Amino acid sequence: MINKISKILFAFLFVMGLQSANAQTIRIASVSGPDHHHNKALNWFADKVNKQNIGVTFKVLSGGQLGKSERAYIEGMQQGTIQMSQVSTGPMAGFVGEFDIFSLPYMFRDTAHFKKVLSGPIGDKFLGMLDAKGMKGLAWFDNGYRNMFNGTKPVTEPSDMAGLKIRVMKSPLMVNTVNAMGGSATPMAYGELYTALKQGVLDGGENAAGNVLNDKFFEVSKYYSITQHFRPPGVVVMSKKTWNSLSGSQQKAISKAAAQL
């Protein structure tokens, strides 16, 4: 009897070992630093799925290890060279034009309004639009309100933007909004912004407080003004090539974990 149990246990461990050895590794690309709250959430997601031993292992590669721009990540996911990422709706609008609506200034009344829109049928409809573009939309992120920062002066009214060269995401609405405020909007990859500010190529940027703190933009910008002009969400996306390589049970487990982000 003991010998029989030993054989069963050995067979079980052998099969589990094979599953582990054959597990697919999915790398999640992120432009933000390792301590950024986005990556803390993505690591939570990865740990949650990894512990289920479904034959898929997730690994977050932060700090632009797979590229310095979210646009490059989106192109990579379409081509299948980037497996998964969390990107902003601003650059996504360059591939799915409807996403640019999230770059409208002062679009959401408050956090409750923001969450209600994205957690309902409207949010689901936008995630579904990614299918035709070679991507699978999994979940939304709250990136927070974006505020103006620069090294010259505080911004308390639109006229204060005059003469300021401000980095924005590559979104037509964002570019037009900052220009309408009197600034000079300059689309640039997020990973290049710190150096551009340090070298004086740009005067400032606009982003959420968490990003400014985590990526240390306060070292190269003196003023952070609470303008709350944009609140574009982030979207967690997987390449359709990667998604289609997964089994139905794996897809279900991943979707369930992503829904809790």
Predicted regions and their residues:
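Absolute protein N-terminus
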Residues: 1, 23-24
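Sec/Tat signal peptide C-region and signal peptidase I cleavage site
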Residues: 17-23
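Bacterial N-terminal signal peptides
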Residues: 8-17
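N-terminal secretory/targeting leader peptides
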Residues: 24-113, 121-124, 128-261
